[in-house]
Curated annotation (Swiss-Prot):
The active site is at K55 (charge relay system), S143 (charge relay system), S167 (acyl-ester intermediate). GO terms for cellular component: glutamyl-tRNA(Gln) amidotransferase complex; mitochondrion. This is Glutamyl-tRNA(Gln) amidotransferase subunit A, mitochondrial. It comes from the Eukaryota.
Length: 542
């Protein structure tokens, strides 16, 4: 048995390092959709209707009428290439009832695992570069890159994505659109193919903040209820009606639609996290971040430095917790109970049937190994292996449990820094210098000033060229994990966060980046109101 495990381990690692999922032909198109609704099927938009693109890990049934053929829900994977869901995700049904017309299912990193939307069985997603000639493609970010490009190109008014560690905000920052991740538990996850249950959050993308705010808070007609108020009994992580009312009662801006007048910035306190000013931060983004902060200050806002000591460990904790949950969620894909059955022989067949008991081993495991070898892409296999190891008895204490401890510390840092208390806590967090050892540097002992929002970049760089991304993926496939360094902390804490477009100037010329605002739990309504004002200010200034 041990010999068999050794052969399988060698086979898996060999496969992860050798197979690519994209081709030069596929890379020449933007490739933002996996499936589209035919144009002749789309009626003219009526009042209150809008075009909706849905990330292809969110279940849909027929496009816009029961007579039409259901679209597939592939998750960007060979395993689900022909899967048609018998039911529809709650969030899609909710948006249909508000006038959404589905235009297609968007491309993504397989099962939502990636930062550039290149780990997909349907070809890498790209965006046209602003810096150079239009033939040059740049990364669209991930994993909701297809949704971001669909909005940026004007093919959708609203796009749904999923944000596990930044998969809505990062593509929004790269493509120059707005990407919103609500508080964990606000929007239903029923019908979303899970990656990491404790982190997965449905997010929305649009060119402006207001269309997103109208869906979350309710329209100006005061008839359509905001999504924030809708509990889904089919989703165990959806906050109950009572909890929603209790949370909203402690917050502003939930009493009606977003005001038409800009939200006043005077006396609002924005925190600038010291730990986010990292060495890897692009000088052009650092300059634009500073310029945006200065502009807000000139309009009456207060800008103060704050310290979030534990967030420097957030990225490491995330890449322990998320793969661990993924390895469990993806165990059902075996080609027998769930997923496509692959019948063609693969190199795994020969490896499994080596040895004296080859036929017996073949009968036991060849179908399972063949399906998972052919069905999963490289990045998914990498995270499954990592997750399975961190959940093993040998690594549980040293990795998974410590990562969960870091997650609690990250959440505590955020709760201490915000002026508003977390409505899910019985008592507010307190900052105590005595809790920090003497070896901790002075900057980490800077007691957090209570702020309304945190202001920081969405990503440390602008969108890289796609050919450079693909080349780097070959040499160092985990280097892309660094792109999530500013988005992961809010995900670990379950906080609302939004990325708004910010123009930057670098050696290649003008480009787009994202400016991120993070709020306290369930402060989504005020966050959206402030984000609209900030987006307008940044657009005028930079």
């Amino acid at each position: 048995m041990s010999a068999r495990i050794g052969r399988l381990r060698g086979l898996c690692l060999r496969h992860v390092s050798s197979t690519r999922q994209t081709s030069p032909i596929q890379r020449r198109s933007l490739n933002q959709f996996i499936s589209r609704v035919q144009q002749h099927d789309q009626p003219a938009l009526e009042q209150r209707q809008f075009r909706l693109a849905v990330k292809d890990n969110i279940a849909t049934v027929s496009p816009n009428s029961e007579e039409e053929t259901p679209l597939t829900t592939t998750c960007g994977s060979n395993f689900l290439a022909n899967y048609r869901s018998p039911f529809e995700a709650t969030i899609v049904s909710q948006l249909r009832s508000r006038g959404a017309l589905l235009v297609g299912k968007t491309n993504l990193d397989e099962f939502g695992m990636g930062s550039h939307s290149v780990h997909t069985a349907f070809g890498a997603v790209a965006q046209e570069g602003e810096h150079e000639q239009q033939a040059v493609k740049h990364s669209a970010g991930g994993s909701s890159g297809g949704s971001a490009v669909a909005v940026a190109t004007g093919e959708a008014d609203i796009a749904l994505g999923t944000d596990t560690g930044g998969s809505v905000r990062l593509p929004a920052g790269y493509t120059g659109v707005v990407g919103f991740k609500p508080s964990y538990g606000m929007l239903s996850r029923y019908g979303v193919v899970p990656y990491a249950n404790s982190l997965d959050t449905v997010g929305l993308l649009a060119k402006e903040v207001r269309p997103i705010a109208e869906l979350i808070l309710g329209g100006a007609d005061k008839v359509t209820r905001g999504l924030w108020a809708e509990h889904d009994p089919l989703d165990p992580t959806s906050l109950s009606h009572g909890a929603r009312r209790r949370c909203a009662s402690q917050r502003d801006c939930y009493t009606g639609p977003l005001p038409k007048d800009p939200y006043p910035l005077k006396n609002l306190k924005f925190g600038l996290p010291l730990e986010y000013n990292i060495t890897e931060l692009s000088p052009s983004i650092r300059h634009s971040w500073s310029a945006a902060a200065a502009k807000l200050q000139s309009l009456g806002a207060r800008l103060v430095p704050v310290s979030l000591p534990s967030t420097r460990h957030a990225l490491s904790a995330y890449y322990v917790i998320a793969p661990a949950e993924a390895s469990s969620n993806l165990a059902k894909y075996d080609g027998i109970r769930y997923g496509t059955r692959f019948t063609s022989p693969t190199e795994s067949d020969a490896a499994i049937s080596e040895g004296p008991e080859g036929r017996e081993e073949e009968e036991e495991g060849i179908l399972y190994a063949r399906a998972r070898t052919a069905g999963f892409g490289d990045e998914v296999k990498r995270r499954i292996l990592l997750g399975a190891y961190t959940l093993s008895s040998a690594a549980m204490d040293n990795y998974f449990l410590k990562a969960q401890k870091v997650r609690r510390l990250v959440r505590r840092d955020f709760n201490r820094v915000f002026a508003l208390p977390n409505p899910l806590l019985d008592k507010p967090e307190r900052f105590e210098l005595s809790e920090l050892p003497e070896t901790v540097g002075l900057e980490d002992k800077w007691g957090p000033t209570e702020v309304d929002f945190l202001l920081c970049p969405t990503a440390p760089t602008t969108a890289p060229r796609l050919d450079e991304v693909l080349s780097e993926e070959e040499k160092d496939p985990v280097s892309a994990y660094m792109n999530d360094v500013f988005t992961v902390p809010a995900s670990l804490a379950g906080l609302p966060a939004i990325s708004v477009p910010m123009r930057v100037e670098d050696k290649e010329g003008a480009g787009m980046a994202g400016l991120q605002l993070i709020g306290q739990y369930w402060d989504d309504a005020r966050l959206l109101a402030v984000a609209e004002t900030v987006a307008d200010v940044v657009r005028e200034e930079l």
